[in-house]
């Protein structure tokens, strides 16, 4: 690979953690990665890890050479869907089962039923296999990629490594500027997670940005080029049909999907049905050769609250259901993309209809944003909707950064978007009772109650920022074991008071109710002795 400037990326363990591996039975040389949090109690807590070798201090990182190929992969033996239907538990399925803490047979069964996908192109041997499906932990995708205005290969590779460090389960390279092929090659060869693309962007670049000049042959050749490189899943806007375009005429924001608008423009210019739709069978045959997963794009998704759940959106969704059946008949894995901008009370209907019309194919949604009024904070507006739609059964959430609608995200925006969406995904998993989801909450809550500050930081989604915020007011090392923080101070920490109650009960042989009454009486006297003041100077 060649690049204008060789990338420089962040490496080394996340604070309070180390990289550990578990040997995978039956697959010689295969090791399943985890982030191990080392607790001050002498125990440890292992977390799902997406960071690849970049957080392993013993790994040699050579971005020019790329990551090593994973052991156990088998080429030219069909797709994961075909092999699952045949009753085979592939090396990838076994790897995923160990990662997720789930039975391998469940992994195989969900893939066979089309309710889960394993994006793993035969030509992308660098990835650590993962699964997208509602029976498993909700995943998060991070979009990166250059534009015609800004960014470079080095910046995009750095964003990829940075996003996976903080928990991105997949990456989409949405480059639309210069060096699209080269940028994608650098990302693929160095990505430990599946990489998705939208091939119509590169196809459009080949015709100098004029949608009317696109042809099936140009698009097909672009898809094959990307399959050969190793792209794991591709967004295809094959559901944007000529007859659906007029349904968007009275929308507040029209067609907001780039791919959707490109195909709508082509359909109107030629007054013909989309070549993605009319050539879908051939596209399936190409995808099957490489085991590339369809991400059937929602080109008519709502771009504003006013347009949510309208006729255009749901007409396209029905067509995506038809295409899902066709793809599966070719043995190709499929997931369905979803909105968008949707008020909270309309979110669940999207999941219900997707599951009904698309045979429960994994749902992959962009947010949705629950309100339109907060540019610069759309990682928050969308995380609200994302948590709701995750609880309802969405399998993967596409992050939104603070720069959404405003500009190309930088490194900080990428991290902010990933963290916001890891929160939404985890909240959704908790709400739907996903196995293992609450274990991390319990571990952190216990550390919080026992004033093990360093353990709290290490167990959090963002240890660096948690420590930074704590240390802004209590930077001294003894504060890491203090039984208070700067919010309440040493006298009125609720958890310290509760600990005092428990200690009092144990010391005096009282049951909890008696202890509470006695201890609260003591605290009442203590409060009066300090002048009945709610807030005290930190020095006290």
Swiss-Prot record:
<feature type="binding site">
    <location>
        <position position="488"/>
    </location>
    <ligand>
        <name>[4Fe-4S] cluster</name>
    </ligand>
</feature>
<feature type="binding site">
    <location>
        <position position="405"/>
    </location>
    <ligand>
        <name>Zn(2+)</name>
    </ligand>
</feature>
<keyword id="KW-0784">Thiamine biosynthesis</keyword>
<dbReference type="GO" id="GO:0016830">
    <property type="term" value="F:carbon-carbon lyase activity"/>
</dbReference>
<feature type="binding site">
    <location>
        <position position="337"/>
    </location>
    <ligand>
        <name>substrate</name>
    </ligand>
</feature>
<feature type="binding site">
    <location>
        <position position="364"/>
    </location>
    <ligand>
        <name>substrate</name>
    </ligand>
</feature>
<feature type="binding site">
    <location>
        <position position="341"/>
    </location>
    <ligand>
        <name>Zn(2+)</name>
    </ligand>
</feature>
<dbReference type="InterPro" id="IPR002817">
    <property type="entry name" value="ThiC/BzaA/B"/>
</dbReference>
<keyword id="KW-0479">Metal-binding</keyword>
<feature type="binding site">
    <location>
        <position position="201"/>
    </location>
    <ligand>
        <name>substrate</name>
    </ligand>
</feature>
<feature type="binding site">
    <location>
        <position position="172"/>
    </location>
    <ligand>
        <name>substrate</name>
    </ligand>
</feature>
<dbReference type="GO" id="GO:0009228">
    <property type="term" value="P:thiamine biosynthetic process"/>
</dbReference>
<comment type="similarity">
    <text>Belongs to the ThiC family.</text>
</comment>
<feature type="binding site">
    <location>
        <position position="143"/>
    </location>
    <ligand>
        <name>substrate</name>
    </ligand>
</feature>
<feature type="binding site">
    <location>
        <position position="485"/>
    </location>
    <ligand>
        <name>[4Fe-4S] cluster</name>
    </ligand>
</feature>
<feature type="binding site">
    <location>
        <position position="493"/>
    </location>
    <ligand>
        <name>[4Fe-4S] cluster</name>
    </ligand>
</feature>
<protein>
    <recommendedName>
        <fullName>Phosphomethylpyrimidine synthase</fullName>
        <ecNumber>4.1.99.17</ecNumber>
    </recommendedName>
</protein>
<dbReference type="InterPro" id="IPR038521">
    <property type="entry name" value="ThiC/Bza_core_dom"/>
</dbReference>
<dbReference type="Pfam" id="PF13667">
    <property type="entry name" value="ThiC-associated"/>
</dbReference>
<comment type="function">
    <text>Catalyzes the synthesis of the hydroxymethylpyrimidine phosphate (HMP-P) moiety of thiamine from aminoimidazole ribotide (AIR) in a radical S-adenosyl-L-methionine (SAM)-dependent reaction.</text>
</comment>
<dbReference type="Pfam" id="PF01964">
    <property type="entry name" value="ThiC_Rad_SAM"/>
</dbReference>
<dbReference type="GO" id="GO:0051539">
    <property type="term" value="F:4 iron, 4 sulfur cluster binding"/>
</dbReference>
<keyword id="KW-0862">Zinc</keyword>
<feature type="binding site">
    <location>
        <begin position="298"/>
        <end position="301"/>
    </location>
    <ligand>
        <name>substrate</name>
    </ligand>
</feature>
<keyword id="KW-0949">S-adenosyl-L-methionine</keyword>
<dbReference type="InterPro" id="IPR037509">
    <property type="entry name" value="ThiC"/>
</dbReference>
<keyword id="KW-0411">Iron-sulfur</keyword>
<keyword id="KW-0456">Lyase</keyword>
<dbReference type="GO" id="GO:0005829">
    <property type="term" value="C:cytosol"/>
</dbReference>
<dbReference type="GO" id="GO:0009229">
    <property type="term" value="P:thiamine diphosphate biosynthetic process"/>
</dbReference>
<feature type="binding site">
    <location>
        <begin position="257"/>
        <end position="259"/>
    </location>
    <ligand>
        <name>substrate</name>
    </ligand>
</feature>
<feature type="binding site">
    <location>
        <position position="237"/>
    </location>
    <ligand>
        <name>substrate</name>
    </ligand>
</feature>
<keyword id="KW-0408">Iron</keyword>
<keyword id="KW-0004">4Fe-4S</keyword>
<comment type="pathway">
    <text>Cofactor biosynthesis; thiamine diphosphate biosynthesis.</text>
</comment>
<dbReference type="GO" id="GO:0008270">
    <property type="term" value="F:zinc ion binding"/>
</dbReference>
<dbReference type="InterPro" id="IPR025747">
    <property type="entry name" value="ThiC-associated_dom"/>
</dbReference>
């Amino acid at each position: 690979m060649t690049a204008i400037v060789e990338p420089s990326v962040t490496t080394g363990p996340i604070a309070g953690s180390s990289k550990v591996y578990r040997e995978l039975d039956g697959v010689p040389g295969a090791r399943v990665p985890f982030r191990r949090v080392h607790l001050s109690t002498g125990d440890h807590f292992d977390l799902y890890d997406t960071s690849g070798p970049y957080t392993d201090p013993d790994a040699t990182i050579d971005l020019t050479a790329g990551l090593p190929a994973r052991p156990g992969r088998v080429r030219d033996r069909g797709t994961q869907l075909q092999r699952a239907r045949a009753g085979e538990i592939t090396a990838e399925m076994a790897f995923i089962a160990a990662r997720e803490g789930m039975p391998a047979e469940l992994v195989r069964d969900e893939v066979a039923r089309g309710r889960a996908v394993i994006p793993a192109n035969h030509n992308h041997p660098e990835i650590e296999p993962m699964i997208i499906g509602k029976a498993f932990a909700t995943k998060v995708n991070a979009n990166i990629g250059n534009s015609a205005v800004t960014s470079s290969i080095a910046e995009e590779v750095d964003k990829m490594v940075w996003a996976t460090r903080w928990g991105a389960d997949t990456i989409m390279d949405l480059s639309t500027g210069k060096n699209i092929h080269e940028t994608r090659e650098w990302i693929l060869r160095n990505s430990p997670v599946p990489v998705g693309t939208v091939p119509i962007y590169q196809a459009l670049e080949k015709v100098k940005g004029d949608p009317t000049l696109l042809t099936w042959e140009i698009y097909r050749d672009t898809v094959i080029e990307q399959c050969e490189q190793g792209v794991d899943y591709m967004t295809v806007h094959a559901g944007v049909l000529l007859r659906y375009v007029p349904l968007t005429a009275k929308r507040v924001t029209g067609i907001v999907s780039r791919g959707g608008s490109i195909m709508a423009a082509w359909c109107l210019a030629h007054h013909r049905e989309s070549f993605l739709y009319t050539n879908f069978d051939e596209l399936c045959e190409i995808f099957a050769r490489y085991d590339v997963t369809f991400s059937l794009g929602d080109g008519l998704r709502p771009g504003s609250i006013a347009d949510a759940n309208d006729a255009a959106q749901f007409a396209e969704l029905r067509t995506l259901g038809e295409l899902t059946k066709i793809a599966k008949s070719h043995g190709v894995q499929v997931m369905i993309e979803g909105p968008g901008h949707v008020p909270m009370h309309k979110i669940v209907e999207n999941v219900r209809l997707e599951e009904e019309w698309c045979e429960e194919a994994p749902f992959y949604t962009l947010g949705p944003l629950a309100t339109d009024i907060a540019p610069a904070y759309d990682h928050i507006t969308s995380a609200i909707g994302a948590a709701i739609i995750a609880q309802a059964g969405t399998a993967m959430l596409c992050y939104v950064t603070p720069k959404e609608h405003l500009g190309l995200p930088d490194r900080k925006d990428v991290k902010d978007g990933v963290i916001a969406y890891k929160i939404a995904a985890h909240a959704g998993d908790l709400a739907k009772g996903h196995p293992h989801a609450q274990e991390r909450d319990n571990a952190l809550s216990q550390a919080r109650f026992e004033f093990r500050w360093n353990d709290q930081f290490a167990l959090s989604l963002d240890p660096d920022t948690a420590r930074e915020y704590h240390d802004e007011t209590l930077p001294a090392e003894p504060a890491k074991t203090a039984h208070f923080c700067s919010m309440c101070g040493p006298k009125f920490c609720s958890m310290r008071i509760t600990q005092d109650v428990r200690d009092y009960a144990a010391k005096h042989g009282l049951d909890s109710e008696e202890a509470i009454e006695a201890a609260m009486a003591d605290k009442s006297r203590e409060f009066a002795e300090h002048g009945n003041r709610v807030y005290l100077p930190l020095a006290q």
